[in-house]
UniProtKB/Swiss-Prot annotation:
Receptor for tyrosine, L-DOPA and dopamine. After binding to L-DOPA, stimulates Ca(2+) influx into the cytoplasm, increases secretion of the neurotrophic factor SERPINF1 and relocalizes beta arrestin at the plasma membrane; this ligand-dependent signaling occurs through a G(q)-mediated pathway in melanocytic cells. Its activity is mediated by G proteins which activate the phosphoinositide signaling pathway. Also plays a role as an intracellular G protein-coupled receptor involved in melanosome biogenesis, organization and transport. It holds the Pfam family Ocular_alb. This is G-protein coupled receptor 143. Disulfide bonds: none annotated. Its main location: membrane. One of its GO terms (cellular component) is nuclear body. Residues 49-78, 146-153, 213-248, 314-405 are cytoplasmic. Residues 221-238 are annotated as: Necessary for its G protein-activation ability and normal distribution of melanosomes.
Length: 405
């Protein structure tokens, strides 16, 4: 579970609100974290094996899009962060004597405090990087649709995601543990920067990503209408697929992390009270404990739920391969009509070979749409670029295709 309270636990003194949640059934809480994290790792491994098996039956992609690299990086960050939660919870359950020495000021063994700080910073860093990568994904898909030239720079995204994650994590840790671990958490002036650096990437994703996704969906609709000047049923289905994917992403993020925001709001409210153990605050205390346990279950499950949002429910099966709907679009050609309508993506010019289309600066419009609807090898919709008329294969019905989503 990714929470700034994990870092505060390493301090010898806790505020009353932190004491309220950290001392309430700690073994049960870490058992829930361990179970949720282990389930995410096991099912994630099954999904990875299933994806590799399905890739073996396809021609390898020549140049993966930047969004594919971004999703792989976000998945890796979430996987390693979840692994940190599993290791931390395992130690908490298996070695209670080791954990008791963490907050002991007079203890001579530095390893308990070192493990506490290291595991807390490890979890915070990787989940922060995951949030930055998800923000980069929203930015990238919007830029791919909107701009007319150039190619996404994955190096810039690496610098942005890892640089900001490391910077905020180090700054929050220095402010929290200054001047030393044995003398930290002596007031809100030390703790607040730690909270800000922890939740800033999360709040950015929850606020900015829906805006970028909405703008992308609007641009995709304009792009599909501009291909032939009409908006066919297949193009409506294509737009619905992209819109559904973005909706699933935000639904997972809100479901997994809204409990963190509610919990921290309740704990901050309790910290402002002169006596948090008053009878009038009993319901708020119970709500804080409840959301604390919900965080322990949902935070490690984020990666699994996001992968299901991207790849579908059948991604966790090693044998089930759902029928795919293959839509072949006509490639764009240089014409007078294109001169009157400037598409938001890179223009394409036909060469001598009628089966090939040369892209000026990057992906064709078909590939751009494929990036948005098929970031995985297990997507329910595939789009292939080909000349000629529109040809639909393996389509039972549009309602069945929407049912698979």
């Amino acid at each position: 579970m990714a929470s700034p309270r994990l870092g505060i636990f390493c301090c010898p003194t806790w505020d009353a609100a932190t004491q309220l949640v950290l001392s309430f059934q700690p073994r049960v809480f870490h058992a829930l974290c361990l179970g949720s994290g282990t389930l995410r790792l096991v099912l994630g491994l099954l999904q990875l094996l299933s994806g590799r098996r399905s890739v073996g039956h396809r021609a390898p992609a020549t140049s993966p899009a930047a969004s594919v690299h971004i999703l792989r990086a976000a998945t890796a960050c979430d996987l390693l962060g979840c692994l940190g939660i599993v290791i931390r919870s395992t130690v908490w359950i298996a070695y209670p004597e080791f954990i008791e020495n963490i907050s002991n000021v007079n203890a001579t063994d530095i390893w308990p405090a070192t493990f506490c700080v290291g595991s807390a910073m490890w979890i915070q860093l990787l989940y922060s990087a995951c949030f930055w990568w998800l923000f980069c994904y929203a930015v990238d898909v919007y830029l791919v649709i909107r701009r007319s030239a150039g190619r996404s720079t994955i190096l810039l995204y690496h610098i942005m995601a890892w640089g900001l994650a490391v910077l905020l994590c180090v700054e929050g840790a220095v402010m929290l543990y200054y001047p030393s671990v044995s003398r930290c958490e002596r007031g809100l002036d030390h703790a607040i920067p730690h909270y800000v650096t922890t939740y800033l990437p999360l709040l950015l994703v929850l606020v900015a990503n829906p805006i970028l996704f909405h703008k992308t969906v609007t641009s995709v609709a304009s792009l599909l209408k501009g291909r032939k000047g009409v908006y066919t049923e297949n193009e409506r289905l294509m737009g619905a697929v992209i819109k559904t994917r973005f909706f699933k992403i935000m639904l997972v993020l809100i479901a997994c992390w809204l409990s963190n925001i509610i919990n921290e709001s309740l704990l901050f409210y309790l910290e402002m009270q002169p006596d948090i153990h008053g009878g009038s605050l009993k319901r708020i205390q119970n709500a804080a404990r409840t959301t604390w346990f919900i965080m322990g279950i949902l935070n490690p499950a984020q990666g699994l739920l996001l992968s299901l949002a991207f790849y579908g429910w059948t991604g966790c099966s090693l044998d089930v391969h759902p029928p795919k709907m293959v839509i072949q679009w006509e490639t764009m050609t240089a014409s007078a009509a294109e001169g009157t309508y400037q598409t938001p993506v890179r223009s394409c010019v036909p060469h001598q070979n009628p089966r090939k289309v040369v892209c000026v600066g990057g992906h064709t419009s078909d590939e751009v749409l494929s990036i948005l609807s098929e970031d995985s090898d297990a997507s329910t919709v595939e789009i292939h670029t080909a000349t000629g008329s529109c040809n639909i294969k393996e389509v039972d019905s549009i309602s069945q295709a929407q049912g698979e989503l």
